[in-house]
């Protein structure tokens, strides 16, 4: 029976962390925020190599990982951690375009989720997001890394072999243009990518993807899904219409609603209504 870290802690809500960031100022801010919330910070590191060593020595429940660091960067550090001692990793990502690309590379290596660093005055921005950061750290700490990675590898392997996970032969009869809804939060991007890779083309799905992710990242996420899948994938726009063989990704910071149907195509709307369960 696979155990999450919460189960391994005997149901104890206490969480331990290691903070890796090349900025001493950022390390101090993050450590203070986590410790103020009752999270036990076992150690810090200013580069990827020291970060890996600290994780191996202290065996934390979660690691917060900067990406751009001298020497061993965050992507290589995530790769080493997952190879030597699989541990849930939360990437702290910059909003810039290259930051988004690096973030997805880190998630390919096994990072569970990411948290967007605020732009502008870093200390002010982070403190305003204290509650969200702490909540994300706790959620990532409880992720079952082995199960998530195994599922992603299975779907990738099946797709590469031409048979999707749980797929039926090509001769199977599907409903006319069925609609598939995919919703995900912590740890979702890698799994969602595996699902899109494995979807049978002959099913001609209309796919709606809602992945909790900041605006500015969902467009690049859609591009990655488009590259990985035989379906045509794009970021949703207000009033978009979607037919069979197409997939859309809800824009970060917006709700995605199905507002109409005609000629085999769905019409969707984007709204900025109040968050539901603290997300939008």
Where are these regions (language model features)?
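Short hydrophobic/Thr-rich beta-strand motif most characteristic of the beta2 strand and flanking loop
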Residues: 38-46, 54
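Hydrophobic "anchor" residues on beta-strands that sit immediately upstream
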Residues: 17-18, 62
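Active-site beta3 strand of CheY-like receiver
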Residues: 58-64
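Conserved acidic carboxylate
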Residues: 21
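Conserved acid/base catalytic micro-environments in cytosolic active-site loops
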Residues: 2-6, 11, 16, 24-32, ...
């Amino acid at each position: 029976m696979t155990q999450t870290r919460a189960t391994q802690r005997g149901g104890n809500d206490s969480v331990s962390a290691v903070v890796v960031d090349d900025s001493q100022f950022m390390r101090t801010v993050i450590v203070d925020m986590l410790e103020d919330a009752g999270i036990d910070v076992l150690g810090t590191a200013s580069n990827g190599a020291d970060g890996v060593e600290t994780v191996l020595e202290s065996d934390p429940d979660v690691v917060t990982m900067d990406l751009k660091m001298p020497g061993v960067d965050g992507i290589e550090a995530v790769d080493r951690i997952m190879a030597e001692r699989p541990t849930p990793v939360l990437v702290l990502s910059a909003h810039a375009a290259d930051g988004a690309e690096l973030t997805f590379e880190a998630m390919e290596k096994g990072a569970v989720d990411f948290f967007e660093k605020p732009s502008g005055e870093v200390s002010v921005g982070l403190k305003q997001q204290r509650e969200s950061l702490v909540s994300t750290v706790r959620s990532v700490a409880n992720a079952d890394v082995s199960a998530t990675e195994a599922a992603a590898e299975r779907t990738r392997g099946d797709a590469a072999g031409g048979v999707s996970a749980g797929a039926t032969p090509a001769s199977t009869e599907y409903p006319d243009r069925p609609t598939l809804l995919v919703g995900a939060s912590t740890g979702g991007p890698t799994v969602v990518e595996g699902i899109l890779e494995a979807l049978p083309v002959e099913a001609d799905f209309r796919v709606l993807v809602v992945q909790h992710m900041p605006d500015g990242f969902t467009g690049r996420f859609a591009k990655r899904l488009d590259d990985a899948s035989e379906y045509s994938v794009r970021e949703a726009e207000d009033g978009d219409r979607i037919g069979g063989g197409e997939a859309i990704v809800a824009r970060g910071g917006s709700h995605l609603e199905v507002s109409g149907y005609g000629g085999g195509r769905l019409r969707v709307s984007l709204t900025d209504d109040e968050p539901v369960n603290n997300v939008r």
